[in-house]
């Protein structure tokens, strides 16, 4: 029996990676015709349009090269093939409840009919519901893994035992050379312990350990935990262009980011304005477009979360001044396509719900003099197409150690004991996702 498998791809895979068809080694890749139609429908989508157009261009290039796509053509360098499947659409092979006119049913019919012919079929999708449906009709299904990274669980913090003399030197000189810290990623926060003394530092771009002072503040906010102090130190460092703040709900991610932004705009005047982008997903993955009202009315609940945080950090007079002078914008991510953000302190809130390509698009919009902060909690992904090993997690692993990038996972909850208790209970109930 041949080891060659047949992989049926759905639209979500090609929107995630337009070059996916060439990444299945020696195996056969099948794209149902309905996927081409779905790509066509996404050509002008505010976030996914570029990826849809790129995938369609690649199919057109293959058409020009090979003449037709309804028969297997070679792709990649390892003997794999690709074809667009026009047949195998008969839904009779599916259970009665799945014989609908939906695109999902058409994709399932294609995969099931190929499997009925004896092929070793796997349906590949980034869409959780479609993978569940495939399993329900007896088909093998898998997530698209070609873009996955091995998530190391890197928190951005490290603990080192050292001599008390090193700690004294760090306080005296503000920076020391520690052999044990040279192999740590750039901007890693370090808890130094030795001889009854302790200090907090971080690895700088020169692989030296610089002191993180506990009295640093941004717009009146000081870090309470070691992680928050390191995060604040990074947020106030203009040389770090991308700062990633992870952590559970209530650990202070948004507060730190907003205070750093207001400090940059109002106090230091290094940036013109703070721009907060939020993805258009509600709890459960509902897109904003399904809600009634104008765009501003739809954005109300999303923007209010930012204003609630600000109200706890600044007086009403300061908040009114910031808004009246246009120093703060809260926008849906749909507004970032085609923009170049110059001299802006950009905050991408709830970044865990963004697919990697969308997140990279956001980062590519940064213009001269701009910085970006990503706040995220991997456990609260509302976009069902984002897994634990892609999206912001993949970006962190790829950028880890670069002098322009820093990441810190915040651990201590700053909300009420009730909120902290409920967060822990929910994690115990749902388990890892």
From Swiss-Prot:
Gene3D superfamilies hit by this protein: 5'-nuclease (3.40.50.1010), P-loop containing nucleotide triphosphate hydrolases (3.40.50.300)
EC code(s) of this entry: 3.1.-.-, 5.6.2.5
GO terms under cellular component: cytosol; plasma membrane
Keyword GTP-binding: yes
Molecular function terms, GO-annotated: ATP binding; GTP binding; isomerase activity; metal ion binding; nuclease activity
Entry keywords, A to Z: ATP-binding, GTP-binding, Hydrolase, Isomerase, Magnesium, Metal-binding, Nuclease, Nucleotide-binding, Toxin-antitoxin system
Pfam families noted in UniProt: PhoH (PF02562), PIN_4 (PF13638)
Ranges of residues in domain PINc: 5-132
Assembly information from the UniProt record: Interacts with antitoxin PhoAT.
Name of this protein: Protein PhoH2
Designated gene of the protein: phoH2
């Amino acid at each position: 029996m041949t080891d060659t498998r047949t992989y049926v791809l759905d639209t979500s895979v090609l929107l995630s990676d337009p070059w996916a068809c060439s990444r299945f080694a020696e195996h056969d890749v099948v794209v149902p015709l309905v996927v081409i139609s779905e790509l066509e429908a996404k050509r002008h989508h505010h976030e996914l349009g570029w990826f849809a157009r790129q995938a369609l261009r690649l199919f057109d290039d293959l058409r020009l090269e090979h003449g037709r796509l309804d028969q297997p053509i070679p792709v990649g360098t390892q003997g794999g093939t690709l074809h667009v499947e026009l047949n195998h659409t008969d839904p009779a092979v599916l259970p009665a409840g799945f014989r609908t006119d939906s695109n999902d049913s058409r994709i399932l019919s294609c995969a099931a009919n190929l499997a009925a012919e004896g092929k070793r079929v796997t349906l590949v999708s980034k869409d959780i519901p479609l993978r569940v449906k495939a399993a329900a009709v007896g088909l093998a299904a898998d997530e698209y893994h070609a873009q996955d990274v091995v998530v190391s669980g890197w928190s951005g913090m490290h603990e080192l035992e050292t001599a008390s003399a090193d700690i004294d030197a760090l306080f005296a000189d503000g920076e020391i050379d520690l052999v044990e810290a040279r192999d740590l990623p750039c901007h890693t926060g370090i808890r130094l312990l030795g001889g009854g003394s302790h200090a907090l530092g971080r690895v700088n771009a020169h692989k030296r350990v610089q002191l993180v002072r506990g009295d640093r503040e941004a717009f009146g906010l000081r870090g309470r935990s070691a992680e928050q102090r390191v995060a604040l130190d990074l947020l106030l460092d203009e040389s770090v262009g991308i700062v990633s703040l992870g952590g559970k709900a209530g650990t202070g991610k948004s507060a730190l980011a907003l205070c750093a932004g207001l400090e940059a705009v109002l106090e230091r005047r290094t940036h013109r304005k703070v721009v907060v982008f939020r993805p258009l997903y509600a709890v459960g993955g509902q897109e904003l477009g399904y809600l009634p009202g104008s765009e501003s009315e739809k954005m109300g609940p999303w923007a209010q979360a930012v204003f609630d945080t600000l109200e706890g950090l600044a007086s009403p007079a300061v908040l009114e001044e910031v808004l009246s002078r246009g120093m703060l914008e809260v926008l849906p991510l749909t507004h970032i396509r085609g923009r170049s953000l110059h001299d802006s302190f950009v905050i991408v809130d709830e970044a865990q719900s963004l697919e990697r390509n969308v997140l990279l698009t956001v980062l590519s919009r940064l213009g001269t003099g701009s910085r970006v902060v990503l706040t995220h909690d991997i456990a609260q992904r509302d976009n069902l197409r984002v897994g634990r090993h892609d999206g912001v997690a993949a970006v962190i692993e790829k950028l880890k150690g670069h002098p322009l990038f820093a990441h810190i996972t915040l651990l201590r909850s700053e909300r009420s004991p009730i909120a902290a208790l409920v967060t822990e209970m929910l994690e115990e109930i749902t388990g890892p996702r």
